[in-house]
């Protein structure tokens, strides 16, 4: 399938999102679509698949002008879109999720479970994934849910698959499996639009790259004809001299200390400490127990045994409000479900953990609240027309900034960041890193969980590595390398 989008314009109200964008997808190619959050990448693909109607411009498929009325029609015509926000029904089984809306029936009109199971098993095996078809999708890891989405798209016999941040929650092994599937699809003439902020992946798996900025097409190039620095410059319109800002740590006293922390079947006897002004990175493979440990420290899933000390005093953290009272903030890996109330305003989201400070007499002082929110929006350079804009309508990078603003507002002693830049563009990543430096300069102790090794190496003063629920090693900034971390993460010494 050959797709040609030419001179595309699209506005939402007064907001001009796309201005004269052109994009071409050739048969059997993997084409990267890159740009900062808000550049218009997802909007362009939503126009292609019929979710939105374009204002002007043309879309040609195999030389014929074609416009779909909705995504289902696009799917029926061979174009599947795997969104960054997974379209998973958590209470339904893996099998039901794979066939929802396109169930197979026998000649008598009954559901043909036998055939559906066989097809589902075949597709998951093709992806190299082992998941019980009877398991509820909500009980699957985020990585497994992502694989279910990919399998669902492949089962439609799509000729074009749009993948929006497909590896954001996948392990290294799962990424390699996905790349193997992409290469096989490519050989069979399937075209892939690959939307990602992970530059290493783009240069590994893609044939061409189109860069967008501020709703316009900047350039399209073959991967061998460009490099990381050129792409970043075209994305942000400026040089990013260093990927990670320089750190000059000056650690103070121990603020957070965890001793012999255990949760049955998840992690065992983990001890570590974090000092004021320090960033401690926590690395390990998906499923190692990193996030679960942080959730326990924050009181979301309390420890079975072990102790937590804040500034030398034992703290009973049985629920998140206990942690907040002790000065702990937690930015979760899943900002959409746990970090934000999507259908409320930026103002309400930022103010939420801080309501007590605006309500000394039992009612909210609206003026104080607004001044507080405006200050944080300005400080974190959150791009929005109004504090009353719903969080759902922000780009990924700006949503993450709102989550960070929410917790900065409590004046934390300890800030836990779980995958702080997942799904965030290069420019916004650097802003988040600079903010982390500002916080540590003010004495905040930061614990950062990340699956991106360059991020761990670029921002951590110390690195803790977790393997299968145990602390397998601790490395200083000078001793930490990708090879050393991966050795410890896979059980080596």
From Swiss-Prot:
Catalytic activity, EC: 7.5.2.7
Coiled coil: none
Keywords (A to Z) from UniProt: ATP-binding, Cell membrane, Membrane, Nucleotide-binding, Repeat, Sugar transport, Translocase, Transport
Catalytic activity: D-ribose(out) + ATP + H2O = D-ribose(in) + ADP + phosphate + H(+)
Pfam families (UniProt xref): ABC_tran
Top EC class, one word: translocase
Annotated ranges, domain ABC transporter: 3-239, 252-493
GO function terms (MF aspect): ABC-type D-ribose transporter activity; ATP binding; ATP hydrolysis activity
Record's bilayer topology term: Peripheral membrane protein
Gene3D superfamilies: P-loop containing nucleotide triphosphate hydrolases
Amino-acid positions noted as binding ATP in the UniProt annotation, renumbered to this chain: 35-42
Disulfide-linked positions: none
Cellular localisation: Cell membrane
UniProt superkingdom: Bacteria
Known partners and oligomeric status: The complex is composed of an ATP-binding protein (RbsA), two transmembrane proteins (RbsC) and a solute-binding protein (RbsB).
General function of this protein: Part of the ABC transporter complex RbsABC involved in ribose import. Responsible for energy coupling to the transport system.
Name under which the protein is recorded: Ribose import ATP-binding protein RbsA
Species annotation: Bacillus licheniformis (strain ATCC 14580 / DSM 13 / JCM 2505 / CCUG 7422 / NBRC 12200 / NCIMB 9375 / NCTC 10341 / NRRL NRS-1264 / Gibson 46)
Taxonomic lineage from the root: Bacteria, Bacillati, Bacillota, Bacilli, Bacillales
UniProt gene name: rbsA
């Amino acid at each position: 399938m050959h797709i040609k989008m030419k001179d595309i314009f699209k506005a939402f109200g007064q907001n001009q999102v796309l201005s004269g964008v052109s994009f071409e997808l050739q048969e059997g190619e993997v084409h990267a679509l890159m740009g900062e959050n808000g550049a218009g990448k997802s909007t362009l693909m939503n126009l292609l698949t019929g979710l939105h109607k374009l204002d002007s411009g043309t879309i040609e498929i195999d030389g014929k002008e074609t416009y779909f009325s909705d995504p289902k029609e696009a799917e029926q015509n061979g174009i599947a879109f795997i969104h960054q926000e997974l379209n998973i029904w958590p209470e339904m089984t893996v099998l039901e999720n794979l066939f929802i809306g396109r169930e197979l029936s026998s000649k008598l009109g009954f559901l043909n479970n036998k055939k559906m199971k066989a097809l589902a098993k075949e597709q998951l095996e093709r992806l190299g994934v082992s998941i019980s078809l009877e398991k509820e999708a909500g009980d699957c890891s985020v990585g497994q849910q992502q694989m279910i989405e990919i399998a669902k798209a492949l089962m439609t016999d799509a000729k074009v698959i749009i993948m929006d941040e497909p590896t954001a929650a996948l392990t290294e092994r799962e990424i390699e499996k996905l790349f193997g599937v992409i290469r096989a699809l490519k050989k069979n003439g399937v075209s892939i639009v690959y939307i990602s902020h992970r530059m290493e992946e783009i240069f590994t798996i893609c044939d061409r790259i189109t860069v967008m900025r501020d709703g316009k097409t900047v350039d399209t190039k073959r991967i061998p004809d460009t490099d990381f620095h050129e792409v970043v410059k075209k994305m942000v319109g400026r040089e990013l001299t260093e990927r990670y800002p320089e750190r000059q740590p000056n650690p103070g006293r121990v603020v957070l200390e965890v001793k012999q922390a255990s949760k049955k079947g998840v992690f065992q006897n983990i001890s570590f400490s974090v000092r004021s002004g320090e960033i401690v990175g926590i690395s390990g493979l998906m499923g190692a127990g990193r996030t679960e440990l942080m959730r326990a420290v924050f009181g979301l899933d309390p420890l079975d045994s072990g102790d937590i000390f804040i500034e030398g005093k034992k703290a009973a953290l049985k629920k998140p409000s206990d942690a907040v009272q002790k000065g702990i903030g937690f930015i979760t890996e899943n900002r959409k479900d746990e970090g934000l109330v999507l259908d409320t305003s930026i103002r309400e989201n930022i103010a939420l953990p801080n309501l007590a400070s605006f309500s000394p007499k039992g009612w909210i002082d609206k003026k104080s609240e607004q001044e507080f929110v405006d200050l944080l929006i300005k400080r974190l350079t959150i791009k929005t027309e109004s504090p009353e804009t719903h969080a759902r309508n922000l780009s990924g990078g700006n949503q993450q900034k709102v989550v960070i603003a929410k917790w900065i507002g409590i004046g934390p002693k300890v800030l836990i960041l779980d995958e702080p830049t997942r799904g965030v563009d290069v420019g916004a990543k650097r802003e988040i890193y600079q903010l982390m430096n500002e916080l540590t300069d003010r004495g905040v102790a930061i614990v950062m969980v990340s699956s991106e090794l360059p991020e761990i190496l670029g921002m951590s003063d110390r690195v803790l590595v977790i393997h299968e629920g145990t602390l397998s090693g601790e490395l200083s900034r000078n001793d930490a390398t990708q090879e050393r971390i991966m050795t410890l993460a896979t059980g080596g010494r």
